[in-house]
């Protein structure tokens, strides 16, 4: 399975992406999430995801 990281500052959208999509159907699993660009960068280094889904404009860092 491909590892997915969700990086989105709006909690409602982040939760929607995580729980409304059937990730296993597309051979993926959500391994982490982040609410800021800086958190996302830290998670990328720690989790080494295959796919990062991110917002374009984020607090701290785009």
Locate predicted features.
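Receiver (REC) domain switch-region micro-motif
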Residues: 52
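Non-catalytic signal-transmission and effector/linker regions of two-component phosphorelay proteins
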Residues: 1-3
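Receiver (REC) domain active-site loop signature in two-component systems and cognate sites
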Residues: 58
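Conserved acidic carboxylate
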Residues: 8
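Two-component/phosphorelay signaling modules centered on CheY-like receiver
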Residues: 11-32
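Active-site residues of response regulator receiver
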Residues: 55
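Conserved catalytic motifs of ABC-family nucleotide-binding domains
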Residues: 48
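Helix N-cap/capping motif at the beta->alpha junctions
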Residues: 33-42
């Amino acid at each position: 399975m491909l590892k997915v990281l969700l990086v989105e500052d709006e909690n409602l959208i982040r939760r929607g992406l995580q729980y409304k999509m059937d990730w296993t159907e597309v051979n993926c699993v959500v391994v982490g999430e982040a609410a800021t660009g800086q958190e996302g960068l830290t998670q990328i280094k720690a989790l080494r995801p295959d796919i990062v889904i991110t917002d374009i404009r984020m607090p701290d860092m785009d």
